[in-house]
């Protein structure tokens, strides 16, 4: 006997009427800022990657890059946006949102990281699977598989909110140091990190919105009791605790070689704590860490909600929106005759 859905948002429909207009708005927002990985000119950073970064900095970049592509493939693939979440919420507007987010992960972010690896000469089969030989990185992937296996929509969306809003941001914080404090290393690559950060922040918020909507509807139907809320809160707090421990261990791998000039382990761990607190708040939970936002947070938060004014040194090519309307385009015959 099939399981009865616990809420409207978990109930399939043959209609195309959007009951959740916010999901349509977020899908349109994400589509409007889609950026092709090939546009950024990461190849121009080859000199930095090969000669201008010191061994400590290059080690950190290579270590982070060794697992980032795997993250993107899982988050955008069947495990989450490209499969699981669309099945948990079988409504057309939610599936539209899932499709556009999956496309961003698989058709923008993952190729972008691959271009960086190609420039460094690391885009090989061995490189993309070397995380399996590292017990810390392998444990992280095992954790992602575990939460992806859950059939509880609330647990899955909470996990995705953390993965996109905290886990990925640890790597972003590390990379951002190369273009802060007066440093201008790998500027084209960091431009992609800026774009990824905006995208992933949006995805984390979308997952949290799905979480909150689902929980609200379940409660209204009597399918989310006080006891359920206590269990859910405990699950989320444990998830946050495990992620914090994992991230700090992974962060330490980035600094195994001493001498990084652009960011410290303490600063990165502080940023990880800040991001975990932010996601907890999105999920209606109390903060886990009693620390204010640190220096790395300051590098990001102005950019997540505003558009930078480009200058001579700003390599970012992501400060645009495709907001033209086809029906408003006109054909100027006099210009055509000049060709």
Show which residues each predicted segment covers.
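Non-heme di-metal
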Residues: 1-339
């Amino acid at each position: 006997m099939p399981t009865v859905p616990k809420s409207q948002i978990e109930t399939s429909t043959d209609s195309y009427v959007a009951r959740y207009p916010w999901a349509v708005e977020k899908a349109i927002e994400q589509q409007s800022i889609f950026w092709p990985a090939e546009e950024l000119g990461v190849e121009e950073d080859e000199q930095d990657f090969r000669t201008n970064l010191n061994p400590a900095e290059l080690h950190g970049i290579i270590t982070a890059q060794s697992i980032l592509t795997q993250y993107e493939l899982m988050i955008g693939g069947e495990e989450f946006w490209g499969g699981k979440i669309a099945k948990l919420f079988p409504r057309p507007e939610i599936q539209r949102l899932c499709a556009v987010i999956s496309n961003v992960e698989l058709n923008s972010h993952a190729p972008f990281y691959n271009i960086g690896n190609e420039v460094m000469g690391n885009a090989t089969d061995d490189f993309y699977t070397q995380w399996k030989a590292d017990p810390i990185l392998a444990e992280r992937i095992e954790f992602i598989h575990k939460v992806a296996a859950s059939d509880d929509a609330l647990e899955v969306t909470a996990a995705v909110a953390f993965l996109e809003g905290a886990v990925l941001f640890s790597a972003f914080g590390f990379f951002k140091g190369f273009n802060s404090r007066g440093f201008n290393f790998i500027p084209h690559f960091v431009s992609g990190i800026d774009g990824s950060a905006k995208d992933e922040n949006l995805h984390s918020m979308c997952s949290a919105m799905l979480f909150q909507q689902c929980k609200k509807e379940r409660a209204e139907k009597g399918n989310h009791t006080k006891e359920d809320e206590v269990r859910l809160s405990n699950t989320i707090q444990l998830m946050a605790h495990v992620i914090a421990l994992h991230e700090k261990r992974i962060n330490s791998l980035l600094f195994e070689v001493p001498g990084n000039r652009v960011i410290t382990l303490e600063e990165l761990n502080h940023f990880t704590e800040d991001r975990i607190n932010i996601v907890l708040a999105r999920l209606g939970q109390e903060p886990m860490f009693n620390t204010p936002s640190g220096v790395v947070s300051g590098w990001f938060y102005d950019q997540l909600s505003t558009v930078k004014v480009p200058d001579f040194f700003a390599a970012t090519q992501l400060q645009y929106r495709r907001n033209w309307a086809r029906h408003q385009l006109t054909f100027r015959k006099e210009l055509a005759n000049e060709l």
